[in-house]
């Protein structure tokens, strides 16, 4: 079970809302979100209702302003608790759509796709075990995309506008 608290103002001030499960529409509870406290679990926050728009991965900790979670604004309109995973993590990445081209099997985090694999685009992937977060830029920066187990035949399937990937990591409650 997870627990997250949203605050309208920075530094955990103003009206707050505590949440312990997925919520497709947070607009009824607060109008803006400038700070967050994650007491337990890993969460994905979304800038729009129904799990749409920019995504932000948060794990246990305190985030006194939205820039701490790489937010573009104070708009958080939905959230989901990411299921805990205790086994191994496995994902296959491909250089072309529909699982074609060069394939690499991944079992751990990658700070820089370019440095490790000498390419910077992933066109399709298959998450076999665990949940992962892809980042648009190296060092876990830029736009973020939650990947649950399943097949993603093209980058549009995980919500990206292009195939650019800079880094990725396993969703874990600790690092």
UniProtKB/Swiss-Prot annotation:
InterPro entries: Beta/Gamma-Crystallin, Beta/gamma_crystallin, G_crystallin-like. Coiled coil: none annotated. GO terms for biological process: eye development; lens development in camera-type eye; lens fiber cell development; lens fiber cell morphogenesis. GO terms for cellular component: cytoplasm; nucleus. SUPFAM superfamilies: gamma-Crystallin-like (SSF49695). PROSITE patterns: CRYSTALLIN_BETA_GAMMA. GO terms for molecular function: structural constituent of eye lens. Keywords: Eye lens protein, Repeat. SMART domains: XTALbg. Residues 84-88 are annotated as: Connecting peptide. Residues 2-40, 41-83, 89-129, 130-172 form the Beta/gamma crystallin 'Greek key' domain. Has a two-domain beta-structure, folded into four very similar Greek key motifs. Crystallins are the dominant structural components of the vertebrate eye lens. There are six different gamma crystallins identified in mouse lens. Belongs to the beta/gamma-crystallin family. This is Gamma-crystallin B. It comes from Mus musculus (Mouse). The lineage of its organism: Eukaryota, Metazoa, Chordata, Craniata, Vertebrata.
């Amino acid at each position: 079970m997870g627990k997250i608290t949203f605050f309208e103002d920075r530094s955990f001030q103003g009206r707050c809302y505590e949440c312990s499960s997925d919520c497709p529409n947070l607009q009824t509870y607060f109008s803006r979100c400038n700070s967050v406290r994650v007491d337990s679990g890993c969460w994905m926050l979304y800038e729009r209702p129904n799990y749409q728009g920019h995504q932000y991965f948060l794990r246990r900790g305190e985030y006194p302003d939205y820039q701490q979670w790489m937010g573009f604004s104070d708009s958080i309109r939905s959230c989901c608790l990411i299921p805990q995973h205790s086994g191994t993590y496995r994902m296959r990445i491909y250089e072309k759509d529909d699982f074609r081209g060069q394939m690499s099997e991944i079992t751990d985090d990658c700070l820089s796709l370019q440095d490790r694999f000498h390419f910077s685009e992933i066109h399709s992937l298959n998450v076999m075990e665990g949940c992962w977060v892809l980042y648009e830029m190296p060092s876990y920066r830029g736009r973020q995309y939650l990947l649950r187990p399943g097949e993603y035949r093209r980058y549009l399937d995980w919500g990206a506008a292009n195939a650019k990937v800079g880094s990725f990591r396993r969703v874990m409650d600790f690092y």
